[in-house]
């Protein structure tokens, strides 16, 4: 098997704080914190104490950032092959893998200290479990082992609303699990759409994403099926009395639009449509949770 190339390291003097920030995948962490904050705000009537909002999200962000750093290290060789990732700090050699792992360890330790001392142990251990699930189980094993990597590993990425919820209540509750289920159902169509757009790169890197192993048509059909499942799952907060009419209208509108993208992708098999589907999926998730939050402060359960 031909070894994947690793770019030559650059001189240490070129390292900046921006390189370390990039290791933490700040955009991904920001989306996770958005869903965590919404989980906190949905957990109880009114607004949680400022200390829970501050320290809870700080701890979650630190541990999420640590998981992202480990991902950079584990995927170093893969990242050098893909155009989207070849300029990452570890892939280019700007930051050595051991330095990155040390940085991840510091972030994880700080995150655990913040959550245990300032929030509660349940949230701390659940967040750590998410880190291990993403950085260990998914990145080290599932990503390279099965085309169902996203489906199985998606649970780790779906945890932030539950973490926010437990930060406020100190316990796992059914409505919090509904939020996890929504993100869990959203994950496959989100990543498979990107995988269709980047199919050649994933194949070159040896990652068995569904379009690589089973083809575009099979993947597009499964995107449609998961989008239908997501539409159904997204209505559960209304069905269970967690939310009201505002959320129902918003969830239907957003979900039907997502379904339209999925149908268009299945009919056209176009890389541009796949990319647009991927982009819309991000808008969908953010908008859905914002609508759920707005509904929470307007709707009063009977």
From Swiss-Prot:
<keyword id="KW-0472">Membrane</keyword>
<dbReference type="GO" id="GO:0048034">
    <property type="term" value="P:heme O biosynthetic process"/>
</dbReference>
<dbReference type="Pfam" id="PF01040">
    <property type="entry name" value="UbiA"/>
</dbReference>
<feature type="transmembrane region" description="Helical">
    <location>
        <begin position="95"/>
        <end position="115"/>
    </location>
</feature>
<keyword id="KW-1133">Transmembrane helix</keyword>
<dbReference type="GO" id="GO:0008495">
    <property type="term" value="F:protoheme IX farnesyltransferase activity"/>
</dbReference>
<feature type="transmembrane region" description="Helical">
    <location>
        <begin position="150"/>
        <end position="170"/>
    </location>
</feature>
<feature type="transmembrane region" description="Helical">
    <location>
        <begin position="282"/>
        <end position="302"/>
    </location>
</feature>
<keyword id="KW-0808">Transferase</keyword>
<feature type="transmembrane region" description="Helical">
    <location>
        <begin position="243"/>
        <end position="263"/>
    </location>
</feature>
<keyword id="KW-0812">Transmembrane</keyword>
<feature type="transmembrane region" description="Helical">
    <location>
        <begin position="50"/>
        <end position="70"/>
    </location>
</feature>
<keyword id="KW-1003">Cell membrane</keyword>
<dbReference type="InterPro" id="IPR030470">
    <property type="entry name" value="UbiA_prenylTrfase_CS"/>
</dbReference>
<comment type="similarity">
    <text>Belongs to the UbiA prenyltransferase family. Protoheme IX farnesyltransferase subfamily.</text>
</comment>
<comment type="function">
    <text>Converts heme B (protoheme IX) to heme O by substitution of the vinyl group on carbon 2 of heme B porphyrin ring with a hydroxyethyl farnesyl side group.</text>
</comment>
<dbReference type="InterPro" id="IPR006369">
    <property type="entry name" value="Protohaem_IX_farnesylTrfase"/>
</dbReference>
<dbReference type="GO" id="GO:0005886">
    <property type="term" value="C:plasma membrane"/>
</dbReference>
<feature type="transmembrane region" description="Helical">
    <location>
        <begin position="221"/>
        <end position="241"/>
    </location>
</feature>
<feature type="transmembrane region" description="Helical">
    <location>
        <begin position="122"/>
        <end position="142"/>
    </location>
</feature>
<feature type="transmembrane region" description="Helical">
    <location>
        <begin position="28"/>
        <end position="48"/>
    </location>
</feature>
<keyword id="KW-0997">Cell inner membrane</keyword>
<feature type="transmembrane region" description="Helical">
    <location>
        <begin position="176"/>
        <end position="196"/>
    </location>
</feature>
<dbReference type="InterPro" id="IPR044878">
    <property type="entry name" value="UbiA_sf"/>
</dbReference>
<dbReference type="InterPro" id="IPR000537">
    <property type="entry name" value="UbiA_prenyltransferase"/>
</dbReference>
<keyword id="KW-0350">Heme biosynthesis</keyword>
<comment type="pathway">
    <text>Porphyrin-containing compound metabolism; heme O biosynthesis; heme O from protoheme: step 1/1.</text>
</comment>
<protein>
    <recommendedName>
        <fullName>Protoheme IX farnesyltransferase</fullName>
        <ecNumber>2.5.1.141</ecNumber>
    </recommendedName>
</protein>
């Amino acid at each position: 098997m031909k070894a994947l190339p690793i770019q030559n390291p650059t001189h240490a003097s070129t390292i900046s704080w921006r390189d370390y920030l990039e290791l933490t995948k700040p955009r991904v962490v920001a989306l996770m914190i958005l869903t965590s904050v919404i989980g906190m705000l949905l957990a109880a009537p009114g607004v949680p104490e400022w200390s829970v909002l501050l320290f809870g999200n700080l701890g979650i962000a630190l541990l999420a950032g640590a998981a992202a750093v480990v991902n950079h290290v584990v995927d170093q060789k893969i990242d050098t092959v893909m155009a989207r990732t070849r300029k990452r700090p570890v892939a280019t050699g700007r930051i050595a893998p051991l330095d990155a792992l040390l940085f991840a360890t510091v972030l994880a330790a700080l995150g655990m200290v913040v959550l245990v001392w300032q929030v509660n142990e349940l949230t701390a251990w659940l967040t750590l479990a998410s880190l291990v699930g993403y950085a260990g189980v998914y990145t080290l094993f599932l990503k390279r082992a099965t085309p169902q990597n996203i489906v199985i590993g998606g649970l780790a990425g779906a945890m932030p609303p539950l973490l926010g919820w437990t930060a406020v209540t100190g316990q796992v509750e059914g409505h919090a699990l509904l939020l996890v289920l929504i993100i869990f159902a959203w994950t496959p169509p989100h990543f498979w759409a990107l995988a269709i757009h980047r199919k050649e790169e994933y194949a070159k890197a040896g990652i068995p994403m569904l379009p690589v192993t089973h083809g575009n048509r099979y993947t597009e059909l499964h995107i449609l099926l998961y989008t239908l499942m997501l539409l159904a799952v997204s209505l559960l907060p209304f069905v269970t009395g967690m939310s009201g009419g505002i959320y129902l209208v918003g969830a239907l509108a957003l979900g039907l639009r997502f379904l339209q993208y999925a149908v268009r992708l299945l009919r056209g098999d176009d890389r541009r449509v796949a990319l647009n589907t991927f982009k819309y999926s991000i808008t969908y998730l953010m908008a859905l949770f914002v609508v759920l939050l707005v509904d929470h402060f307007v709707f009063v359960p009977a």
